[in-house]
Structure formats: structure tokens, C-alpha cells
Amino acid sequence: MQPHLSHQPCWSLPSPSVREAASMYGTAVAIFLVILVAALQGSEPPESPFPYHIPLDPEGTLELSWNVSYDQEIIHFQLQVQGPRAGVLFGMSDRGEMENADLVMLWTDGDRTYFADAWSDQKGQIHLDTHQDYQLLQAQRVSNSLSLLFKRPFVTCDPKDYVIEDDTVHLVYGILEEPFQSLEAINTSGLHTGLQQVQLLKPEVSTPAMPADVQTMDIRAPDVLIPSTETTYWCYITELPLHFPRHHIIMYEAIVTEGNEALVHHMEVFQCTNESEAFPMFNGPCDSKMKPDRLNYCRHVLAAWALGAKAFYYPEEAGVPLGSSGSSRFLRLEVHYHNPRNIQGRRDSSGIRLHYTASLRPNEAGIMELGLVYTPLMAIPPQETTFVLTGYCTDRCTQMALPKSGIRIFASQLHTHLTGRKVITVLARDGQQREVVNRDNHYSPHFQEIRMLKNAVTVHQGDVLITSCTYNTENRTMATVGGFGILEEMCVNYVHYYPKTELELCKSAVDDGFLQKYFHIVNRFGNEEVCTCPQASVPQQFASVPWNSFNRDMLKALYNYAPISVHCNKTSAVRFPGNWNLQPLPNITSAVEEPDPRCPIRQTRGPAGPFVVITHGGRH
């Protein structure tokens, strides 16, 4: 007996015969030339449309849309599948691996089509989950595409499920080209699979009204031939018009060339320093030997967009200054192309559109760098899985540089290079950590965007801002030192705040003298392998360290207890007055308490299994 089918969208409980089948099979989907709506447990569709969209694969076969309910702590997903397919998988994993992934599966055995919550083991073998936390709401076939609507709680407390938080999520997908007789017959190693990064839980921020005099400026790299390599960072230098008067940027958004939505991964606009009247023009790969060195001084972030992000609006009371004689006219656009299928011949003119106004807002928004100084004094040994480095914006600096009323941080962009895995900035006051400014426990250096904070953070005089980065150097044989090079490392949080102050950089590094004492200790217990002579550079010294457990532990202890050099810098790159060397680490006696995840109340269900809803031969 067939379940009820309809060519019109509807929301109803499954028929009794389906419920009986559910105890044996679980949930399944009609896929061939029918429209099926199956509502489970009286589920309702999301009232508002899906505001967020991303292509999952470069060919455009899979497109994901989603809608977030913070009240119910549930995400509704809509997955569009183009063309006739034997099935798809979609899910999440810690770093984008297909192994140990939390999955939802749609597959056919050649006769029936099934939908089920599943997971993959460390060998990529797929298994049915004992808790079916992905709930199918609707399946609809239109022309040559299939649309699946399903939902899942943020937190399920199922050990096989991924905890969805407001940091980066590594989405995985796969396309099944042939039937499988059972779910257990599927292994991810034999599928066409891929990875996409996104922030699923975006803060609910109201959209300010645009003023009548708003204007736009497009920063686009013209007619780029996208390289057929997997990863390309493209740099383009442009300039503002001569005598461009002072304006406020109040919003920006991405402009992505049609057809390239799956290839343009993220983009940033940087303002160059004002040290020179002119910067050389350039339009090419950022790692090109032809790229002028001066482009490294174009690193003041004006705008940053990543796949899945919508337009970025500044608070009504603040805007980012653009123009005037006191700032550089030169801007650098950086576009990250992600081309895992090595597609050739694709042209692109993507970029970022700035919305600006001559009606200056009450406050100018500033950008402050927190974290570590770009210096080889801070290093990560090779073969490390979770090595942590921490930079401090000390109470002495905030006391001297911030206004009495404090500042309000409303957005943040975390940044490391290739080995960064986690980043967090915490505000401390009176020796106690008070709140997290921003955190990403699944950070990826290939997915960077300016993110609005759920709640603005007020920083007062005397507060401490602590930024920690966790690195993984398992695949490296030499120490990774801090610096500007892509194979060197950084630990930075660009915080966006108002009102703008003279303080542009508040960072730290270990004291150089204490680092040299570390090298002397290594020599004392290691037969003089590290040169401590004046002509040896710090990178050379780190390259000579034999990385046994003693030397690793000693370096960790050095970074955790040794005095620091604080860079409390003005916009002119000059430090605020005072002696900033040999400063003690801030004395923090308590950490921020982490809330325990709230587990949903589970409804009593029958044995988990793929629930057959319809066979291919059913009438419709």
C-alpha cells in the first residue's frame, strides 16, 4: 500500500501504513518524478524563507540553503540536487574529513529510496545512527532536480553527532552515482566527495536603514583567468580618486561573477600604509615572484567576505573612515579561489562593493590588532598536534590608550596562517576572565570573514585582552616561526570597535633575552647544538633545536611564564610612552565558565532504520 502523494506542497502526518513500516525501515524518500511531502511528529516548516545559501560543489550539482531558529535551537536545511542521482550524503566533521563524520544519507537500492541519519567510522564506512536526529520534512521533485527539506537540533548529545556552534563548520558532501543494496555497503572512499566551510549560526542583527546620499564603489580584479590549481590567492592593487574627501563606509557586500559562486571562496580589501605617495600596480597571484614587496604593507583590513556571508552592516552610530589626506589612497583586493576540480578557462571579475556616505556618523569605527607580534621569537615545534601561543593586550596599555568611557567591540576577524586550528580572545578584568570576545574552535585559515558579535563587548581602561591560537604542525619537520610569510605563522584578532582611538595595535611577544636563555639551556643539556652567537638569527637557532620532549616542554614553559615585550602602538606605529619591555604576564586567577550544552528531550521512537516511503513504481 502506497503512502499519500501530492503534487501540491502540504504538511500532514504520515499514513498508518507508513508508521507501521517505520518500525522496520525508518525514513525514506520518493526521488523519481514525484512530489512527496512527509511531516514527522507534527513538524512545521520554517515561517521565514531561507536567508543563507551556498553551493557545495564547484559543478553546481548541490546547493544548500538554511534557516536558523535560535528559540528552538534548530536548523532547517534545504538541499537542492541537480540531475538524476542515485543518492547524496551531507554532513559535518571536525576538520572536513570524510571519516568520523556526522551524516544524513539519501540512497536507493534500485527499487526503493531511503533517507536516514548516519555516521562514518575512521575507515570511511557508513553506519546507521541509533538516534535519528535529522528529521525529514519534505522531499519534492521538480523537473530535473530534487529538493530535500530536513531539520536538526544544534546539540543532540548523541556521541556520533556534531555539535553545531557559532564558529566555522566544515560541511562534507558526496554524490552517489549507482544504487547500493544497503547503507553499510557504502564507503566514502568510493564516492565523489568534497568539503565546504561556512558559519551556520550567524548572529541575528538588525539591518540599519541606508541614508539617502549613500554611494557605492566596486573593488574588483578585472577579467582574471582563474588558475586551474586547487588554491589560488589573487592580489589586485587599485586606488581611490585624487583628493577623495572623507567618507564613512557603512556597509559592504560581495560581488561574485555569475557562474563562479562555487570557486570564489573568500575576499578581503586591505588599505595600504600611508608611508609612500604611490604603490606599484599589480594584478596577479599573491605568491608570484613578480609581486612587489611593498604590497606586504597593505594589510589594514577594510572589508572581508567569505562564502555564505551576507552583506555586512556597521552599527547605525559608527562608520569606517575612507579618504582624506591622512590616509593612503591605495587598496589591495585579495581573492581566494578554491578550484578542487581544476576547472580551466573560467574568467572572473569578483570583488567587494563598498557602500559609503558623506554624512559622517557620530563615531568613527576603528580596527585594532590583538594577539602576537609578527616575530620569529614565537615559534611552534614540528610534529605538534595542539601547540598554543598566547598574546596579550595588557591592562597598562588599555589604561593609557583607551578613553574613560571605554570602547565597544562589535565585530571581529580571526587570523592565522596554515597551521592555525583554533583562535580565541577573552576579556579579563580584575584578574578574572569575564567574557569571550570571539572564538572559533574549528578555525580554518582558508575561511576568514569579519563576523558580527552576538553582543557588543565593552572594554574599559585597565582591562586585559588575551588572544590564544592553537596550531597543528604534524606535517612539518622544522620549527614554524612567526612572521609574514605564508609558511610562517600569525595569531591575530582584528577587532572592529568604536569610538576610534589612537591605539591601533596591542600585542606581545616573549622577551628576547629570556628566549636566548632558553637556547642556552638547550645547549647545556644538548651538547651545544644551538648557536647562541650574535650572528645567528632566531629562525636559524630554532632550526638547530633537537625537538625532544625536554626541549618542547621547556619552550612551552618559557611562553607560559617568561616576561613579555608589549607593543602598545599608535596609528603612527610608534609605541605609547613608557617602558614596555620585560613586562610580567597578566595575573589571571579564573577562567570563563563554559555553559554545558542543553540536550533535547528525546521522543520515544522505534528501532532506527531507513524508512521506506515509496517504491519507484508507485502511482502519483
From Swiss-Prot:
Amino acids binding Cu(2+) B: 415, 417, 490
Topological domain spans for side Intragranular: 41-620
Gene3D superfamilies documented for this protein: 2.60.120.230, Copper type II, ascorbate-dependent monooxygenase, N-terminal domain
SMART domains: DoH
Swiss-Prot/TrEMBL cofactor(s): Cu(2+)
Site (Cleavage) residue list: 42-43
Protein's recorded name: Dopamine beta-hydroxylase
Glycosylated residues in this chain: 67, 187, 274, 475, 569, 587
EC identifiers of the protein: 1.14.17.1
Assembly notes: Homotetramer; composed of two disulfide-linked dimers.
Phosphoserine PTM positions: 349
InterPro entries: Cu2_ascorb_mOase-like_C (IPR014784), Cu2_ascorb_mOase_CS-1 (IPR020611), Cu2_ascorb_mOase_N (IPR000323), Cu2_ascorb_mOase_N_sf (IPR036939), Cu2_monoox_C (IPR024548), DBH-like (IPR000945), DOH_DOMON (IPR045266), DOMON_domain (IPR005018)
Post-translational modification: Proteolytic cleavage after the membrane-anchor leads to the release of the soluble form.
Any GO MF annotation of the entry: copper ion binding
Swiss-Prot/TrEMBL catalytic activity: dopamine + 2 L-ascorbate + O2 = (R)-noradrenaline + 2 monodehydro-L-ascorbate radical + H2O
Pathway where it operates: Catecholamine biosynthesis; (R)-noradrenaline biosynthesis; (R)-noradrenaline from dopamine: step 1/1
Residues engaged in binding Cu(2+) A: 265-266, 336
Keywords of the record: Catecholamine biosynthesis, Copper, Cytoplasmic vesicle, Disulfide bond, Glycoprotein, Membrane, Metal-binding, Monooxygenase, Oxidoreductase, Phosphoprotein, Secreted, Signal-anchor, Transmembrane, Transmembrane helix, Vitamin C
GO cellular component, one term: terminal bouton
Functional note: Catalyzes the hydroxylation of dopamine to noradrenaline (also known as norepinephrine), and is thus vital for regulation of these neurotransmitters.
